[in-house]
Amino acid sequence: MRMYVKVMAAVIACILLSGEALSAFATTPATENLSWFKKKKKKPEEKEEKSKSDYEKLVEDSKTTKGMFAVHQKKNDYYFEIPTSLLGRDLLVVNKLQRVPTELNDAGVNRGVNYENQMVCMEWDKATGKLMLRQQRPLPLAPQTDAIFRSVKDNFISPLIAAFKIEAVNADSTALVIKVNDIYDGTETSINNVFTNINLGTSAIKNLSRILSIKSFSNNVVATSELTTRVTEGTTTVYVTVEVSSSILLLPEKPMMGRFDNQKVGYFTNPLLSFSDAQQRTDKTQYITRWRMEPKPEDREAYLKGQMVEPAKPIVFYIDNSTPYQWRSYIKKGIEDWQIAFEKAGFKNAIIAKEITDSMHVDMDDVNYSVLTYAASEKKNAMGPSLLDPRSGEILEADIMWWHNVLSMVREWITVQTGTVCPEARNVQLPDALMGDAIRFVACHEVGHSLGLRHNMMGSWAFPTDSLRSEAFTSRMNSTASSIMDYARFNYIAQPGDGVKVLSPHIGPYDMFAIEYGYRWYGKSTPEEEKDILFDFLSKHTDRLYKYSEAQDVRDAVDPRAQNEDLGDDPVRSSLLGIENLKRIVPQILQWTTTGEKGQTYEEASRLYYAVINQWNNYLYHVLANIGGIYIENTIVGDGVKTYTFVEKEKQQASLKFLMDEVLTYPKWLFDTEVGQYTYLLRNTPIGKQENAPTQILKNAQAYILWDLLGNTRLMRMIENESVNGKKAFTVVELMDGLHKNIFGVTERGGIPNVMERSLQKNFLDALLTAAAEPEAVKINKKIANEHFLLDHATPFCSCYAAEQRALRQEERMGAPRVLNFYGSPLNRISDAISVKRGELLRIKKLLQNRLGTSDTAARYHYEDMILRINTALGIK
């Protein structure tokens, strides 16, 4: 079991890599001058005659397939016949998993996962008789007429990563033949290093690895291999075998014209350094990632006059024939829902979904085909990564990963978020139409990523909270948010009797705006020629419906308008309405989960109960973000909008009251329940299923709320607010005083705290103590990062979120995120945050010393324990 867990832990990080946009590469100027091909041929020499003879011997008994490279198979040996016309051309190596063992499947690493890409080119070294493979690393942009261009070439050379003996040259010297067994059978890892990239850190075992096939298509060649490795811990060894495909794709000779990124629209980007003689500092050029969407040459004039036309090459997604039949039509609709957005950009029939059938003449090994891959897995997720031309940001192909068990998460959302207003949502087995509508929106969201769009967590804020209770408003907008790219789910705000019919998210105004920004064709020759046009376009879309904000840390969101899983523009009111619906659901849990099946256990009841508590926990964090929150705008010079505005004092005070009422006071409605008498909360862990008492979940939730509420980054934002706004700010002292009166109120009044009140007091003390001892706080905070019973249960669907977070921290991949910094070691030492916490500790100590005379033994022990902890932390003897 320990070995099994180790393998799972090692590979689970792979899924983050697969959702990332491809690392930004730009072409290195060809180092090999190929003009000698045009010279008059010399009289063949004996050595050349021998080479021709070698060529004839090699191909005469081989099985040959034609394509970009001719592939010759001679028994178990494979050879590429590479046209010399392709030497120096940019090629993209694309590696994907095709079949995986249980260990990877359980970690969510499945068929279709793209684990490694790199751009390469080939060079013929005549002196050594070898074909050299060069990895193309990012090369900064620079005008070739500028003097600095030479320096760019000299200081950004790309490495050679492999060399191949030239086995033969064809009769007219227009093609070279190399043997490729080593790069595909696991011997050599220069272009396919699967076990490192899925974090096993091992090598392929040669005699347990083999090439299964190599196919050649018009612009790519793909090798399929079965590779085996050995993972050892102590005396235990596990063998892991994967089937992988490694494609070499010929990139367009002329890259697609890039389009500049803008902070007001959320696209994945392809950043490149930029140099010029005129600069006084280096710049960074960022192209958005997008498909090549252009009108046909004969339609361009009509298109530019405003007529809608069909694109020269539509985007086509193929739906895996492993997809259950009942869901295929809904997935197809979710993909094609984007058509309305492309129509806004002037293209009809721009995006098409097709089901793969046995009669289709389609080879899914051809890397040109975009596929929705359905994985039989327990993972609750979906993902929409894409394959990029790293020179321009052009999306060449996309693979949507769909893990089967995402259906269980969707089913929970439907029941918990709409069960009070939708009778069909109150069953264990939901109707296909209801599930299908949810599957449609998940597919639509993932396709958005495959079109280049990042999450837009501001989409839900665009719709006022009370408007989501309006049948007229929701019917007109046909969604719960302005963007399908938000993590806005079903309408949990609508109350029984409101008459709201539209409960799920769909394509919204922001999505159509974003697609038009990225995909409208202007017929220009350079990105610079489009800048003014795009600026004018953005200037016409300043309404809140078109606002964009990137994803934030769930536990420390800075802008409360841009959060996961939220709805509406008022976190407190939205959460209170959501809780009202949860209060209606809790008494019905047993009834809604009873199927009548003989021998049924309470496992379904436990799942629904856990889902309700998790939804409640989401509401807590939506409100928490108001405290110490800052509204952050994407501003430009002259627009008259402030970039940073602190959340109003009244909203922060109301948010603290909400937290004190809903989580820092025992929520009897949620934890003193009938269902809790029949089942604890089941939680899957690497070592098996655990049964957690509801009160343990509450203590855990309270601990995290207090930890995150009193985190130094939040408190330092509040201190900055006080510095800027004085008495108009909600201060750290006011926050601490409110918490003290709520948590220690029973003690202040001379009462006897019960078990849960004592636990809450210790949780508060623990948050203060560890933060007051800063080095220890850092260690403990890291330690507990993965111990939240609710947050880890609520991992957001769509691995693109995790990939995006990883990518946002790697400037070379996606561009840097916006980070507001109020934190640092010197600042901590002089900050009021620590002073206020230590002051509160002394206040608590004084109170407890005055209450040591209590007649209740448990309370006295509790007070003595806390006094001892305070003395130890503050060094008081």
Where are these regions (language model features)?
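Bacterial N-terminal signal peptides that target proteins for export
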Residues: 1-9
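Sec-exported extracytoplasmic/periplasmic mature domains
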Residues: 336-347, 448-449, 453, 490, ...
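C-terminal segment of classical bacterial N-terminal signal peptides
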Residues: 15-24
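Auxiliary tRNA-acceptor-end handling modules of aminoacyl-tRNA synthetases
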Residues: 29-79, 83-323, 341, 350, ...
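Soluble non-cytosolic domains of exported or imported proteins
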Residues: 81, 113, 282, 321, ...
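Conserved catalytic/binding loops enriched for acidic/polar residues
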Residues: 460-877
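The catalytic-center signature of Zn2+-dependent metalloproteases
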Residues: 34-36, 50, 355-375, 437-495
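Extended catalytic-interface subdomain
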Residues: 383, 388, 394-399, 443-451, ...
